[in-house]
Amino acid sequence: MISGIINLKKEAGMTSHDAVFKLRKILHEKKIGHGGTLDPDVTGVLPIAVGKATRVIEYMTEAGKVYEGEITIGFSTTTEDASGEVVQTTPITELDGATVDQAMASFEGEITQIPPMYSAVKINGKKLYEYARAGEEVERPQRQVKITEFVRTSPIELENGTARFTFRVACSKGTYVRTLSVDLGVKLGFASHMSALRRTASAGLTLDSSLSLSQISEMVEAGDQSFLLPIEFGVQDLPAVQVTEDDAKEISFGRFISINSQEPLVAAFLGDKVLAIMEKRGQVYKPRKVLSQ
């Protein structure tokens, strides 16, 4: 069994689940998961965990993400992106860049979002997009997210009653960039939607070092496994502690050990190899997930 992290460059037109399905065939490995779902039309970084690394994927998804995309102001859609049907049109003939920049900056910090109807959030055991496809709208719970950066990265192009520009956003997990694009339009007094998006960074992985499915397939055929990052990459956001060989034996048996730390969760290392995720219990630590077996 192979184990590790893959920095996958997801292409447009496939779901995150599709990408995992295809990788299972390429790698001949059933135990594969992804961190951070991307909508079918969204491209870019999709963290993939293989084998034992699936046990640490949850610790990777806590990291922030960076996206680059395009916002179109002038009409809104059912899905808040370019794939939906037009809902409202508000023709625009002029838009000042400074006004847009000021409005974008107002979203930086902690903000509240309501998930879009076309999303995978579950309400009463049913995904929101299932309600939406049935023509139903349900009340959705608000969520707190953090926007570290939200900036315009191109001039504003005015054409056929619309205004388009590209942007970059750095945000916490759970942020809906589609909704952010719509809310920006509301602040400016116009209908809007997100017309393109790609994820350029997630869980410490960046787009410039990501690999497509075809590239990975070619490497596998050539016997090259350099596309696999070590499982240690998946715990880099956790505090790391070094343990002794005696401690390592205790950990392998699932026993408590003493660690000089106050952190609720730590990654226990013996040298450069991660042994386990350890959880603080009173004055000692108990293995939550043993990774060395």
Swiss-Prot record:
UniProt keywords, alphabetically: Isomerase, tRNA processing
Q: Which reaction does it catalyse?
A: uridine(55) in tRNA = pseudouridine(55) in tRNA
Catalytic residues, per the record, are: 39 (nucleophile)
Q: Does this UniProt record's set of keywords contain tRNA processing? A: yes
**Family recorded in the similarity comment:** Belongs to the pseudouridine synthase TruB family. Type 1 subfamily.
Among NCBIfam families, the record links this protein to:
TruB (TIGR00431)
**By what name is this protein known?**
tRNA pseudouridine synthase B
